[in-house]
Amino acid sequence: EERLEKKITQRMEEKQQEYVQEIKMQLIKEELHDVETPQTKEKLEELEKLDTVHLTESVMQRVRPQTLRAIVGQDRAVEAMESKLASVYPQHLLLYGPPGVGKTTAARIVLNEAKKLPFTPFGPDAPFVETDGTTLRWDSRDMTNPLIGSVHDPIYQGARHDLADTGIPEPKPGLVTEAHGGILFIDEIGEMDPMLLNKLLKVLEDKRVKFESAYYDESDPNIPAYIRKLFAEGAPADFVLIGATTRDPSEINPAIRSRCAEIYFEPLVPADIQEIVRNAAKELGAVMEDGVAELIST
């Protein structure tokens, strides 16, 4: 009887440990659904604290043109951009010209002006998404593609913890979706990888990005609604493309040229540079000696 009591006691202890462990695991799973932990909350507070600290704004921010009239030496180019973008049917554009003549600034300001028009398709919150064709990188297997978008599989690419545990792939929309309803500005578009450019052309035609994954099972009841929608319908990507380049038009992919209106920005002449220098000095409250603007322009 004593041996039996010992066995009963031992079995009860084992069952208790199993029960405690089961409760512990359940609590851990519940906590995982709350993505915020004391550590992540602390890091968020640190970031928000950093955001409250500002040094003086850069000189470039101060002197950058804020209106179309402030853009020097590019009257014809700016007028052409207005006619192409500030319309009921805005067109994709290719901007040619040397660096530093105001291509990006003009595009941003024209969008802001176009949003004020009653007939424009651009909404008040239409985004201006800017990237550089020389730095765009992607994986030929589409495991990583910040421009078009990609799918993070649950095994190799570190999907969200709750998705990785259930084996659910997660689509990651790219810059083309971020620019939906607005403008995607690609500086040095002539330097883009040709295959990536072809993918971009496909998006321009479809106005949508499709996602595929061997790990996606549409019958899985655990798939979140947003992931199911992305795999079923794709991500919207209806935007106006503006590509800027310092290359000669003959060096640009004919397929992209055929879809875009072309605008040429002129090199700045000494008189333009002198006007820019004087405007900058006025904006900064600086006093220049005679001949300084002329010296800079030579």
Model-predicted segments: where are they?
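Walker A/P-loop
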Residues: 85-136
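AAA+/P-loop NTPase substrate/partner-engagement loops
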Residues: 116-150, 155, 218-220
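Pre-Walker A (pre-P-loop) alpha-helix and adjacent loop at the N terminus of AAA/AAA+ ATPase modules
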Residues: 55-98
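Conserved catalytic/switch belt of AAA+ P-loop NTPases
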Residues: 152-157, 195-234, 254
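Conserved alpha-helical scaffold flanking the Walker A/P-loop in AAA+ ATPase domains
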Residues: 82-84, 144-183, 224-232
